[in-house]
Amino acid sequence: IVEYNPKTGWAYAVNGQTGKLAAIPLKTMESKDTVDLLDANDIDIKSLVEAADTSFQYGDMTSVTISEDGTRLAVSLQAENYAADGRIALFTCNADGTLSLEKIYETGVQPDMITFTPDGSKLLTADEGEPREGYSKGSTDPQGTVTIVDLASDTVTKADFTAYDSEAN
């Protein structure tokens, strides 16, 4: 998963296994240049988040988004325990491609598809809540939700789908 920041000229590629975000200076690259993502400017999201939120154990980085004005970047992070709540890490984008951690927000289980609203006032994640062992008897089926972060008021709301439970087959 890759996002480009036209304001700074940097692209960011998710490496969920290592917990690092590869920062690629596209603005300064020439057409003859190639990028080895293994040698990119890595930002260790896993270490940054685990140091800032000691209650969270990193499992996977699933998605990245950049605000339309190019000033902020956010990533969605699943917990090591697939049935535990995930996190959003929100960063300020610096001109040199580096990121400064602003805040960490708790999400529902297995957040993915992170996005800013067009006006940049909110962050949204689809919290998948999928069972890892299938739907067999005794398996854990975490609740799916949508997390809404209001950045102005610094509040988190998790919208669930329990109102539709009566419509299940």
Stretches with model-predicted labels:
Residues I1-N169:
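Mobile, glycine-rich extracellular loop/lid and propeptide segments
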